[in-house]
Curated annotation (Swiss-Prot):
UniProt membrane topology term: Multi-pass membrane protein
Name of the featured protein: Na(+)-translocating NADH-quinone reductase subunit D
Catalytic reaction list: a ubiquinone + n Na(+)(in) + NADH + H(+) = a ubiquinol + n Na(+)(out) + NAD(+)
UniProt-listed NCBIfam families: nqrD, PRK09292.1
Protein EC: 7.2.1.1
Length: 210
């Protein structure tokens, strides 16, 4: 059983110290696509966190029984099964958001974060700590999506979760929405800015000069 210090490191380390998007540059594609509004960013964050945590748990539980030659196939089968469950739950209880997320929930199957944690951590670690690792990396992914989604919705649409914060000119207010932020590629610049900010407050993450 892992000690409390190790569990805290596994659970909270991926948020800033070892963020899967900002430091490892994994899972960037979905981060670009689903952050136009905070609501879709939150749902995608929850979906990926659940899949990563439970895939880590199940893979770790059977890791000693998986032949090395087929381990990737087994991992993808478990991950795909969990993604199907999550996708069906979204369609049942939040159909409109499911339509907005489109194929990106299904593409969690190929997300580098999920596959990477299964191979690098769950295959070598006990179930409970693997479960925490999945949650931790999900939180790190969620942190980036929530920050980007909040900025884009607030300054692009003047709202947060659909509630008006900055009254738009077309509605009789004073704020002119930034149309550039509504476009998916603007997430590149925002993620770049977030990476710069994190490496400013944590200079140990800056790559040494060659």
């Amino acid at each position: 059983m892992a000690d409390t210090k190790e569990m805290k490191k596994v659970l909270f380390g991926p948020i800033l110290d070892n963020n899967p998007i900002a430091l490892q540059i994994l899972g960037v594609c979905s981060a670009l696509a689903v952050t136009t509004k905070l609501e879709t960013a939150l749902v995608m964050s929850l979906a990926l966190t659940a899949v990563t945590a439970f895939s880590n748990l199940f893979i770790s539980m059977i890791r000693s029984q998986i032949p090395s030659s087929v381990r990737i196939i087994v991992q993808m089968t478990i991950i795909a099964s969990l993604v199907i469950v999550v996708d069906q739950i979204l369609k049942a209880y939040s159909y409109e958001i499911s339509k907005q997320l489109s194929v990106f929930v299904g593409l969690i199957i190929t997300n580098c974060i999920v596959m990477g944690r299964a191979e690098a951590f769950a295959m070598k670690s006990p179930p409970f700590i693997s479960f925490l690792d999945g949650i931790g990396n999900g939180l790190g992914y969620s942190f980036v999506l929530i920050v980007i989604g909040t900025i884009k919705e607030l300054f692009g649409f003047g709202t947060i979760l659909g509630f008006e914060i900055l009254p738009l000119i077309q509605n009789g207010g004073w704020y002119q929405g930034n149309g550039l932020l509504i476009l998916p590629f603007s997430s590149f610049f925002l993620i770049g800015g977030l990476i710069w900010f994190i490496r400013t407050i944590k200079p140990e993450q800056v790559e040494p000069k060659e």
